[in-house]
């Protein structure tokens, strides 16, 4: 998956982006059992509610960035863990990437997604040097875009398929639930708090 959870002892040091150790884990296991960290149960979360959850988690991200000064969001808590800004850049790019993958799944038969190296992108695009205000704007726009596209899905479209570059197969249903774990999990990464993922009146996750 695109998700990474980089835990390490806290430090005030600001270190080069290439200190991050690439994450080679396959995060498709989140479709089988609840995440022990962020507690999202993607296996049982309704795909039809992903659109709304995307907007709520985007609001949580905007609040995190708005509440912290620029020097704080740029500071890594440890050499091998992204800063809040770097995580936000990653989430913004996940919204963009998965929106394009969703478009492919809805318009083409069994597409294979182009590969994406999240760690290489973080270095090449200089996540740590980006403008937090622009990241906020782009993250909000990306969330609105993919939420709107998920909101159009209905009926048999949930069963349409697509393939990751490593051959892993998704339906639009499993793709939606796999995807939404990423921004939810990264809220936990940067705040240590687990956000409610069900709407008011529904059972909390």
What are these regions (language model features)?
Residues 2-32, 72-122, 144, 159-205:
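Short, contiguous alpha-helical
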Residues 53-66, 121-160:
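Acidic/histidine-rich alpha-helical segments that form the ligand environment
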Residues 35-41, 119-127:
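A short small-residue
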Residues 23, 28-44, 53:
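Secretory/endomembrane lumenal or extracellular ectodomains immediately following the signal peptide
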Residues 50, 54, 80, 139, ...:
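Aromatic-acidic/polar surface patches that form glycan- and anion
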Residues 44-48, 131-136, 176:
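Active-site rim elements
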């Amino acid at each position: 998956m695109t998700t990474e959870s980089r835990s390490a002892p806290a430090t005030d040091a600001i270190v080069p982006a290439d200190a991050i150790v690439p994450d080679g884990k396959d995060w498709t296991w989140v479709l089988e059992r609840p995440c022990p960290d962020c507690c999202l149960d993607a296996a049982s979360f309704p795909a039809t509610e992903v659109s709304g959850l995307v907007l709520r988690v985007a609001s949580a991200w905007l609040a995190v960035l708005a509440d912290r000064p620029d020097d704080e969001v740029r500071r890594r808590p440890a050499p091998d863990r992204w800063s809040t800004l770097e995580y936000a850049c990653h989430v913004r790019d996940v919204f963009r990437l998965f929106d394009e993958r969703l478009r492919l799944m809805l318009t083409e038969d069994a597409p294979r997604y182009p590969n994406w190296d999240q760690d290489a992108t973080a270095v090449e695009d200089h996540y740590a040097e980006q403008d937090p205000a622009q990241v906020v704007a782009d993250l909000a726009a990306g969330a609105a875009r993919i939420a709107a596209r998920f909101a159009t899905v209905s009926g048999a479209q949930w069963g349409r398929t697509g393939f990751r570059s490593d051959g892993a197969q998704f339906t639009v249903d499993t793709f939606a639930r796999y995807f939404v774990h990423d921004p939810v999990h990264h809220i936990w990464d940067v705040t240590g708090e687990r956000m409610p993922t069900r709407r008011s009146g529904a059972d909390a996750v």
